[in-house]
């Protein structure tokens, strides 16, 4: 069994940065992520949206930021496993940990950093007829690449910020955009809703009944007025169902880490109640400190957790790695 200095659980921005920082500290690292692609919410929820609150980037597409984080994480050649769920952790007799996955694999490690965010993300589905049949054949739950919708007739289902933002984003490139919402009040920002009515056809009090197609792609959608039950058939090329994502932490609450709701309780060193186990990012909650779900905050927490873990492994190690600009490993 391969032994690691650190296993990082979660491949979002914080997990990726932690993996990089572990390499910077000369720690053999393994990154495990349950999603199909590294990047966390950046790629799963809003890859085509701009991110403005990460230092050094006045504005960057979420997907591009994720790609740069992945590139940085791979700098010191960590082992990476995606589409694999960290199912259980167990303490060994020699004071190490074994991380067991849903694929039946076991990884022995000196420390663990949990950066799982909200957990494995799966889209909320409506259960409309044809929805599952045409998933990824015209039915989508987010916009991965805006160019995929160029010249297409798009139907968006939802009334929150994501649904309205996608409508505004796609309107300039799509042939047409129609948005339906089951109520007449939107959860989205008021200004965005006003813009929505200028660029899209909007049906309030309407829901999706059925998605139709030719077996290979979507061709129509059936919507209905939930007050009168009157139906409309729309010719569409794509249906984006934007009603949210669910986060699943799996068996994590059974691992023995102290949790409050969905948060893992940590101290100022990002330590949990378990020796050698740390948490950072959205999943970490530090008592007495404000909780800010910001990528920038998570980066700092990851650096602290990795540095403390380094000293846990080697008490003689320096807590501070030094400035990267002065490290030989970065000099060519």
UniProtKB/Swiss-Prot annotation:
- Top-level taxon: Archaea
Cofactor binding, per record: Binds 1 FAD per subunit.
UniProt keyword annotations, A-Z: FAD, Flavoprotein, NADP, Oxidoreductase
What is catalyzed by this enzyme? Answer: 2 reduced [2Fe-2S]-[ferredoxin] + NADP(+) + H(+) = 2 oxidized [2Fe-2S]-[ferredoxin] + NADPH
Residues binding FAD are 33, 41, 46, 86, 121, 282, 325
Q: Provide the E.C. number(s) assigned to this enzyme.
A: 1.18.1.2
PANTHER family listed in its UniProt record: THIOREDOXIN REDUCTASE 1-RELATED-RELATED
This protein's assembly is summarised as: Homodimer.
Into which family does the record put it?
Belongs to the ferredoxin--NADP reductase type 2 family.
Q: What is this protein called?
A: Ferredoxin--NADP reductase
Species for this entry: Sulfurisphaera tokodaii (strain DSM 16993 / JCM 10545 / NBRC 100140 / 7)
């Amino acid at each position: 069994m391969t032994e690691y200095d650190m296993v990082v659980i979660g491949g979002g921005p914080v997990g990726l940065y932690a993996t990089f920082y572990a390499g910077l500290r000369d720690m053999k690292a393994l990154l495990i992520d349950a999603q199909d692609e590294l990047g966390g919410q950046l790629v799963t929820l809003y890859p085509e949206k701009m991110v403005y609150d990460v230092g050094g980037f006045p504005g960057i597409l979420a997907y591009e930021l994720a790609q740069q984080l992945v590139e940085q994480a791979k700098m010191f050649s960590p082992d990476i496993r995606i589409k694999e769920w960290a199912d259980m952790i167990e303490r060994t007799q020699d004071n190490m940990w074994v991380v067991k996955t849903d694929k039946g694999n076991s990884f022995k490690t000196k420390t663990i950093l949990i950066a799982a965010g909200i957990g494995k993300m799966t889209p909320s589905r409506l259960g409309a007829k044809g929805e599952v049949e045409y998933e990824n054949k015209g039915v989508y739950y987010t916009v991965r690449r805006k160019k995929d919708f160029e010249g297409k007739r798009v139907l968006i289902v939802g009334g929150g910020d994501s649904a309205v933002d996608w409508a505004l984003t796609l309107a300039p490139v799509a042939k047409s955009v129609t948005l339906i919402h089951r109520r007449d009040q939107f959860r989205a920002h008021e200004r965005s809703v006003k813009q929505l009515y200028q660029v899209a056809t909007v049906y309030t009090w309407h829901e999706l009944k059925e998605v139709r197609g030719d077996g290979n792609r979507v061709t129509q959608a059936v919507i209905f007025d939930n007050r009168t039950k009157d139906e409309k058939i729309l010719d569409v090329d794509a249906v984006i169902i934007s009603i949210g994502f669910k986060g699943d932490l799996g068996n994590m609450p059974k691992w023995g880490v102290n949790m409050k709701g969905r948060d893992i309780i940590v101290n100022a060193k990002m330590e949990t109640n378990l020796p050698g186990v740390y948490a950072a990012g959205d999943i970490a909650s530090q008592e007495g400190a404000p909780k800010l779900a910001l990528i920038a905050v998570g980066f700092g927490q990851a650096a602290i957790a990795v540095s403390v873990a380094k000293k846990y492994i080697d008490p003689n190690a320096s807590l501070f790695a030094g400035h990267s600009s002065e490290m030989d490993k970065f000099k060519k």
